[in-house]
A protein has these predicted regions:
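Asp-box/WD-like beta-propeller blade repeats and closely related beta-sheet repeat scaffolds
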Residues: 60-63, 75-113
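Short loop/turn segments immediately following the C-termini of beta-strands
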Residues: 22-25, 76-79, 123-127, 140, ...
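Short loop/turn segments immediately following beta-strands, especially the blade-tip
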Residues: 87-93, 147-159, 209-216, 259-263, ...
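Glycine-centered loop/turn motifs
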Residues: 1, 143, 157, 243, ...
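Short, conserved, GDST-rich strand-edge loop motifs in beta-rich repeat architectures
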Residues: 20-38, 122-142, 208, 257, ...
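A short beta-strand motif characteristic of beta-propeller blades
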Residues: 1, 50-56, 93-103, 158-179, ...
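A short loop-to-beta-strand structural motif that recurs across blades of beta-propeller domains
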Residues: 34, 40-43, 83-85, 144-146, ...
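Beta-rich, blade/repeat-based domains predominating
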Residues: 2-14, 39, 55-71, 102-119, ...
């Protein structure tokens, strides 16, 4: 990465790769470290690693979304004071938007995904109630996911709660009903069956939402490594056909290309977490390391050969 910028989220847009490049002097709430003038970027690369374009973005960017064939959305400031940057990748122009009211969860926005034409965003850094013996990370009663719509004033966006942090869900391994306690909504994904997947990072769980909306159903997969709860960042499912993986290592300022000698098995889930790339058994939540020795892996995508 150029200079001291650190890669985070990755996006395949057309035939190029867009990369969040964070200036570490941008705090996650959008403020700057005292005495610094940080400038984070979104960098566009071709598949040979050449820089094609650079977009300077305000605050601490974290999420990327392909809205359509010529538009990329960027979420910035995952702890507080969230903004959206809408980039026209054909005209190479961009616009910054702010929420039309303070988000209910009092935090920022992290990852985004589009499903059936609706944009969903993770409600990161929520204000939670006091910790208890059974809820050491606090107790959530605020939204964990919003839908995002742009307002006609071209300056603001609107957030509508789509999933509460204390929603009722089915625990996948035990097939029992539980009450969620999502204290750290972070990365998002779409699984092969079309479910919206939300990573509640410090809670070490993936939450699956079937048919998001009024008639949605929710299930939760606690994640473990060698029997211990294990937090992850991005999770992706290997596609059919030939592909390779790109994985960003934030503090190492690296993006790895990972190829499987015999090819990736379609439908297998992979997660980046705690210096390791892991496969995920989506029936039990048990994970298996497949690539180790990284610093802080964050963004993960598959790219078709």
């Amino acid at each position: 990465m150029p200079g001291k910028l650190r890669p985070d989220d990755l996006l395949l847009h057309g035939s190029n790769i867009f990369v969040i490049a964070q200036d570490n002097n941008n705090n996650p709430d959008g403020t700057a470290v005292a005495g610094t003038s940080p400038q984070s970027e979104v960098i566009e690369y071709d598949l040979n690693g050449n820089i094609v374009g650079t977009f300077k973005v305000p605050g601490h960017p974290d999420g990327l979304l392909e809205y359509d064939s010529h538009t990329v959305w960027v979420s910035t400031n995952e702890d507080a004071n969230p903004m959206l940057i809408v980039i026209d990748t054909t005209a190479n122009t961009q616009q910054t938007l702010t929420p039309d009211t303070t988000p209910i969860h009092s935090g920022g926005l992290d990852d985004m995904k589009m499903l059936d034409g609706v944009v969903y965003a993770a409600a990161s850094n929520p204000t939670v109630g006091a910790a208890t013996a059974t809820a050491p990370n606090g107790v959530s009663s605020v939204p964990s996911v919003y839908t995002v719509t742009l307002n006609s004033d071209h300056q603001t966006f609107h957030l509508t709660p789509a999933l509460m942090g204390n929603a009722t869900a089915t625990n996948i391994p035990t097939n029992t009903q539980v009450t969620l306690n999502m204290t750290d909504p972070d990365s998002m994904a779409i699984d092969p069956s079309g479910k919206l997947v939300v990573d509640s990072q410090q809670d070490s769980e993936l939450v699956f939402v079937t048919n998001p909306g009024a008639n949605q159903s929710v299930s939760v997969l606690p994640l473990t490594l060698y029997g211990n709860s294990w937090p992850v960042d991005d999770t992706r499912w290997a596609p059919s056909g030939n592909s390779f993986m790109l994985l960003s290592d934030n503090t190492a300022q690296m993006i790895y290309r990972i190829d499987a000698t015999a090819g990736f098995t379609a439908g297998t889930a992979y997660s980046a977490g705690q210096g390791t790339l892991l496969t995920v058994n989506t029936s039990t939540g048990a994970m298996t390391p497949v690539f180790t020795g990284m610093n802080t892996p964050h963004g993960l995508i598959f790219v078709g050969d």
